[in-house]
A protein has these predicted regions:
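N-terminal active-site segment of His-dependent metallophosphoesterases
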Residues: 135-200
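Active-site glycine-centered loops adjacent to acidic/histidine catalytic or metal-binding residues
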Residues: 151, 189-190, 219-220, 313, ...
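Recognizes extended acidic, P/S/T-rich segments that occur
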Residues: 67-113
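Extended active-site neighborhood of metal-dependent phosphoesterases/phosphodiesterases
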Residues: 197-303, 351, 357-358, 374, ...
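Sec-dependent signal peptide cleavage junction
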Residues: 19-30
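His/acidic metal-ligating clusters that form di-metal
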Residues: 175-184, 270, 283-388
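Beta-strand-rich modules
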Residues: 108-125
Length: 455
């Protein structure tokens, strides 16, 4: 770790000295940059980008790699209203002494309509490689699409004028997902700062502007002192716990929070929303009750032959090795991490983990840490993992309000309200799901966090 920190600091110092003219940057060769990119695939599976990227060049620098069209243009897609939605780079590779490599996430997807790999130095296209025919294919007819959000946090982050940033970030996220044509949106909790009524009223107000259902569970901030159940029931998951339930509500728990939904728009897929009951992350303090876990186990057993999306707020530590290198967390240059995971070894945590190990048909959405998707550089499991096929597929949902970053010059986690806002747009097909991480501020898909889930 120390060597890594030293190398990063040296690189930063050199970059700074170059920027102020003390050190002259290495000039580009007189004949220009001559570079090539190669993706050595790890498997023959269509649409899987798993493998190793190798960039060779006569000029040492950082290069960006994009998916492209046959015409050599960066890949884009379109919203239902006709807006162009660009894909970002899917990898960055640093070339040193003429060569650089990057191992790609085993879940990384080749987007539909991608035909080439484009290598860029800054804004200059320096190489184009055609994807093998066996790796590109038309996904076929999409069954439906949906959105996943988390950590909305009304009343927590304010701009310099005193405006609640979530009054902008949340409706913008919903508008983006609506324009992409989603049929339903699931949220992994933390709608508020301290459980205050106004947060839930705002959440309901923006949801009511759209024709699709928006369902959620509770997060730790929704378990704080200002929480009032009647306000929650009136504004959140509206009607689910009434005598006049929305069509598609298959089961509700006696606790007034947890429920199962499978409507016409989900085409047989099952959505489960499962709420924690406390904001305390301590030994022997249960996030969920035994009765909740009994109920959850019953639902998972009932729908074990279905594709199930389980929404919960808090992520779990890795089952082995460094506990902070599991889905939902990172371990930065200084050994720092997000300090509030589901407390490993607690009675409820062990049972919950056991259920996620047994029912591998589940896709488990959780938020809580706010880590931005690019922080995958610190942990390949941050955004998605199934721990080599031993568990349900666990999927990190960043924050629509304030994604967090860290770096060599930013040892402590830094929140980015206003300048960043992220979430997921998911395309569902008969045999797989494509999970697209989204940058709602710039209206783009983060290609480095676009994944294929075979379920």
């Amino acid at each position: 770790m120390l060597a890594n920190i030293v190398n990063k600091f040296i690189a930063l110092i050199l970059a700074f000295l170059m920027s102020i003219g003390i050190i002259t940057p290495t000039p580009i060769p007189p004949g220009g940059i001559e570079a090539s990119v190669e993706l050595n695939f790890a498997n023959d599976e269509k649409a899987s980008a798993a493998g190793t990227l190798t960039v060779t060049s006569n000029y040492d620098a950082e290069y960006s790699v994009y998916w492209g069209t046959l015409g050599g243009e960066k890949l884009t897609t379109y919203s239902e209203s006709g807006k162009t939605v660009p894909y970002t780079e899917f990898a960055k590779v640093t070339v040193k002494d003429g060569e650089g490599e990057k191992e790609l996430n085993s879940f990384l997807a080749i987007p539909q309509n991608a035909k080439t790999i484009l290598l860029y130095y800054d804004d200059q296209l320096v190489d184009t490689e055609t994807l093998p025919l066996g790796k590109t294919f038309a996904y076929g007819a999409e069954t439906y699409s949906f959105g996943s959000l988390s950590d909305v946090h009304f009343n927590r982050y304010y701009d310099e004028a005193g405006n609640d940033i979530s009054q902008t970030s949340y409706p913008r996220a919903l508008n983006f997902l609506d324009d992409m044509g989603v049929s339903i949106v699931g949220v992994s909790g933390d709608l508020s700062k301290e459980g205050e009524d106004s947060a839930y009223v705002s959440f309901n107000k923006y949801n009511s502007e759209h024709d699709f259902n928006v369902f959620t569970c509770k997060g730790n901030h929704d378990c704080k002192d200002k929480f009032n159940y009647e306000t929650w029931k009136e504004n959140i998951n509206v009607g689910v716990f009434s005598d006049n339930k929305p069509d598609g509500v298959l089961a509700v728990s006696d606790n007034g929070y947890d429920f199962v939904y499978s409507g016409k728009e989900t085409h047989g897929d099952v959505f489960i929303f499962f709420s924690q009951i406390t904001d305390k992350y301590l030994p022997f303090v249960q996030l969920v009750t035994d009765e909740q876990l009994d109920w959850l186990e019953t639902q998972l057993e009932t729908y074990k032959d279905k594709r199930v999306y389980l929404y919960f707020h808090t992520f779990l530590n890795a089952p082995s090795g460094n506990p902070f290198l599991g889905e939902g967390n990172i371990y930065n240059d200084y050994g720092l991490f997000y300090i509030l995971p589901y407390f490993t070894g607690n009675k409820d945590e062990k049972r919950f983990r056991g259920l996620l190990t047994e029912y591998k048909n589940v896709i488990f959405f959780n938020g809580h840490s706010h880590w931005t998707y690019s922080m995958e550089e610190y942990n390949e499991n941050l955004n998605i993992t199934d721990y080599d096929g031993t568990t349900a597929t666990m999927v990190h949902v960043s924050s629509s309000a304030a994604p967090r970053t860290t770096s060599i010059t930013q040892p402590i986690q830094h929140s980015n309200p206003g300048t960043m806002s992220e979430g997921l747009y998911l395309n569902v097909y008969p045999d797989f799901v494509i999970s697209n991480a989204c940058d709602f501020v710039n209206g783009q898909i983060l290609a480095y966090a676009t994944y294929k889930i075979d379920k």
